[in-house]
Amino acid sequence: MNKLLITLITFIFLFIYPTSNILANEKGLGVCPQERKTKKAPRIIYRSKNPLEYSSKNIKEGKLIYEKTARPLQCVLCHGIKGNGIGDPDFESTPSARNFTCAQTMTQVPDGQLYWIIKNGSTGTSM
């Protein structure tokens, strides 16, 4: 897997997702749960696990990618600073951006599938 994508996945699962039980219950924090019909990743990718360990270095690198260096657009623009799917109103889309703080949704998305979506986009969405 591409190191930048792996670092971004690590940031999402280790920094944003652990707050999901708290954030998902607050009002105005994105659609939860979210239905998607995203194409399933090839089996070998779908079953792959995030190889990066939980560390402050990996979280810091993932946060930098999420907020500043991802291209063509930074993830934060659509997914929001809290990862709740509420980003810059100029980048709103239908369907709305994935709410990473929604445990009901994110527990159903394996590491490999998330990697596949970040790398290849998701048909019918802004990614």
Model features per residue range: what roles?
Residues 1-8:
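Bacterial N-terminal signal peptides that target proteins for export
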Residues 18-24:
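Sec/Tat signal peptide C-region and signal peptidase I cleavage site
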Residues 56-57, 80-115:
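Gly/Gly-Pro-rich "capping" loops immediately C-terminal to redox-active cysteine motifs
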